Amino acid sequence: MTKAHYIDFFKQAADKKIQWLKEELTKIRTGRPNPKIFDNLLIESYGQKMPLISLAQVTINPPREIIIKPFDPKSNTNAIYSEIQRANIGVQPVIDGEKIRVNFPQITQETRLENIKHVKKIIEQIYQELRVVRRDALQMIKKDNHNEDLENSLKAEIEKINKNYSNQLEEIQKDKEKELLTI
């Protein structure tokens, strides 16, 4: 295997972990409405499950409200409303004519601190998963019996990339904590 193969293996696996983390963090409610909270919502419509964005326009109405305007209000308003309630995401939708208003209540300081703990827990999970990926990459290198110089070079490169991912995780954590503490 080439040097690039080991590096690509590590980077692809680490990128998947970071992408998953970013998606998970969008699900954590902050003080402001975030339409991404509905990204994983699948609505039963036209005989199949469809993502909300393919059935409605989702817009933010500051300071703490999201407006959902179904493209086909007669067919989809009630289904969207029901699915938001069923999703148990801490918001209460209200049907207002042909649109749905979703108010995001002010979260308490206690909830903010609980969310920060949750963020730290998720980030620690990703750190652990990155360590496993790094270990797997290093074992692949060792198993393939390269000369010592190449092996050391590959290990150093993987450690350098791992440090970059660790720094990226620290930044993601700081940004999310700042967002959670902003009132």
Curated annotation (Swiss-Prot):
Gene3D superfamilies: 3.30.1360.40, Ribosome-recycling factor. GO terms for molecular function: ribosomal large subunit binding. GO terms for cellular component: cytoplasm. One of its GO terms (biological process) is translation. CDD domains: RRF. It comes from the Bacteria. The keyword Protein biosynthesis applies. The keyword GTP-binding does not apply. Its main location: cytoplasm. Keywords: Cytoplasm, Protein biosynthesis. It is found in: Cytoplasm. PANTHER family: MITOCHONDRIAL RIBOSOME RECYCLING FACTOR PSEUDO 1, RIBOSOME RECYCLING FACTOR. NCBIfam families: frr (TIGR00496). Responsible for the release of ribosomes from messenger RNA at the termination of protein biosynthesis. May increase the efficiency of translation by recycling ribosomes from one round of translation to another. Belongs to the RRF family. This is Ribosome-recycling factor. The gene is frr.
